[in-house]
Amino acid sequence: MVIFFDIDGTIIDERTHTIPESTIRAVEQLRKNGHTPIINTGRPYFQVDSRVKEMAFQGYSCGCGMEVMLCGEFLVRAKPSLALRQKSVECSRRFHMLSFYETQDGGILLDGEHSVHPLMSREVERLRSAGRPIYELAQT
């Protein structure tokens, strides 16, 4: 049986920011019992906490399914198509929403029009200072 786990509040305790020993043992026991524990998260794989990667998970579904790994091998590493990114920009502008995609190289694809929003400008600055790439969402 395949069993999916989220990270925040399920694997990592939101109050203490730790992984309880009981959680580590439970995931190990699942594998011993023949089950396949998988992490399912909206964040990209590069952002998965190293403590989670050290656990007995056999796979990861990351970035809302844009990256899928099983037994250490990526089966899917997709980038949203230009058409999808352009549609995302169109919809986010129409409904006054912020939209962005985190990329596998640690960068961010965002609608340049929203980069002036305080939340986005802080995130863009944080990524830039970490040497991460910033891409225009609706182009290339």
Regions found by a protein language model. Name each.
Residues 1-16, 39:
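Asp-based phosphoryl-transfer active-site loop
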Residues 1-2, 57, 132:
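Generic intrinsically disordered, low-complexity segments enriched for polar/acidic and small residues
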Residues 19-21:
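A short acidic/small-residue loop/turn micro-motif
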Residues 24-121:
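Active-site phosphate-binding/coordination module
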Residues 116-139:
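Acidic, His- and aromatic-enriched active-site or binding-groove loops in soluble protein domains
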